[in-house]
Amino acid sequence: MAFQGTSRTLTQQSSAATSDELQKILFSPDAIKKMAAECDLGRHHWMRADNAISVRPLVPEVTHGRIASFFKSGYDAGELCSKGYMSVPQVLCAVTRTVSTDAEGSLRIYLADLGDKELSPIDKQCVTLHNHDLPALVSFQPTYDCPMETVGNRKRCFAVVVERHGYVGYTGTTASVCSNWQARFSSKNNNYTHIAAGKTLVLPFNRLAEQTKPSAVARLLKSQLNNIESSQYVLTDSKINQNARSESEELNVESPPVAIGSSSASRFESFRPQVVNGL
C-alpha cells in the first residue's frame, strides 16, 4: 500500500532552532553588512545599460563558506545528519521604473540555482515586466532546499537574476529592483508545493490627489506674490490681482513644500501613502 502521509514532520524538524554559533555567523554586524553590500538585501539595485544582467546570490560568499564549514564540522563529528541546506520560503521583489512610460523596454526576473551553469529559472518561475506596466511586486517560492555545497568554483545557493531588454538610447538607470527574503539553514531538508511566480501590478501613486483644492493653489499664488520686490514690480490695479487669483484657482498644481516640524507639515504628512520598498 502506498504511503498516504505528508512531509509535515520533515518541515517541523527543519525549522528547529539553530545553535548560538550559527546565529552569530548569520546575524553578526559583519554578516549583516555583507548581506546588504553583496546581496542587495532590502536595497535598491539600479538596472543600467552597463549592467544589463544582474545575478544577486541570496547568501554572501564569505557567509556561505562559514555556514558550510559549520555544518561540515558537525557532520564529520557525527553531530549533524547532513552538511547543511539553505531554505528560502519566498523572495519578494518591488520593481519601479525610472524613465518615462514611453520608453520601450522590459525586465525579465527569475530565481535561479547557482549550481546550474545555465542559470535557468527554478521550476519555470519567471516574470517579464514591460516598462509601461511598472510599478509591480513579484514573488518567487523555491520548491526545494538548496544544499550548502561548492560546485566547481561556485558556492551553491539561490540567486535573483534580473535581465534588462530594450531601452534603446537609455544608457542610465531605467528601473529599480528592491528584493527581500529571509534565508534559513538546517541539517534537514524538504520539498514544497509548486507555486507559479506571482506578479501584481501596482497603481502609481497620485500625489496630487489631496492637494488640488483651490485653497492650496491660492496659498501658492499668494506666497509667490508676496516674494516680489515692490521696487521692481508694482501692481497698479487691484482688479488684475483679483483676476489672476480667480484664474489660478482653477489650475491643478501642487502646493509648495512645507517646513518640517511646522503645523502645516504635520497636516500634509497625513496625505502621504503607506509605501512598501519605495513603491
From Swiss-Prot:
Pfam families: 3A. GO terms for biological process: transport of virus in host, cell to cell. Keywords: Host cell junction, Transport, Viral movement protein. InterPro entries: MPV. It comes from the Viruses. GO terms for cellular component: host cell plasmodesma. It is found in: Host cell junction, Host plasmodesma. Belongs to the cucumovirus movement protein family. Transports viral genome to neighboring plant cells directly through plasmosdesmata, without any budding. The movement protein allows efficient cell to cell propagation, by bypassing the host cell wall barrier. Acts by forming a tubular structure at the host plasmodesmata, enlarging it enough to allow free passage of virion capsids. This is Movement protein.
